[in-house]
Amino acid sequence: MKFNDHHNLDGQHAFMGASKYHWINYDDEKLVDTWKNLQAIQRGTELHDFARRCIELRQKLPSRKKTLNMFVNDAIGFNMTPEQILYFSENCFGTADAICFRDNMLRIHDLKTGETKAHMEQLLVYASLFCLEYKQEPDKIEMELRIYQGNEIYVCNPDPIDIRKIGEKIVRFNKLIEKMKNEE
């Protein structure tokens, strides 16, 4: 049999694909909710890309108490780098939405476009990754972490001990993962 050619779909996954088979148990309401959630995730990705471009181009947005506007304008005002990967190993890295380190002050800002309440732990991990990658002692620098969500700004000045503990856990867990990989 000669199968139909669908090479244009290589690497893509359908919303109702076989590998995502859970949809066969959905009712109409669950399907609608799941679809809307997927669309919100895609919109969030597009908004992050838009924010990145605005920051790179230093294009401020109108001064309004809107999540995206506040995030972009603050990142530009603090001369931050958008979408910066913070790397410890292939087992542990992440992308900070906006970051800068100047005058011994680490700033990390995170844009949240969804409705699920964000948690500062993600930014604590970014701060730990920064300290590990750039060999900074958490107790020797100042840190301000911000989450922009729901037209609000949530600010945290983390305890350096917490950042150090997360960093130690990253190092320990990375060694454990590498040991398991070598045993395979």
Model regions and ranges:
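Non-catalytic accessory segments flanking enzymatic or RNA/DNA-binding domains
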Residues: 80, 174-175
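A generic alpha-helix structural signal
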Residues: 51, 72, 127, 167-170, ...
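Nucleic-acid nuclease catalytic cores
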Residues: 86-168
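Accessory terminal regions of nucleic-acid processing enzymes
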Residues: 175-184
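Metal-dependent nuclease catalytic cores that hydrolyze phosphodiester bonds in DNA/RNA
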Residues: 1-95
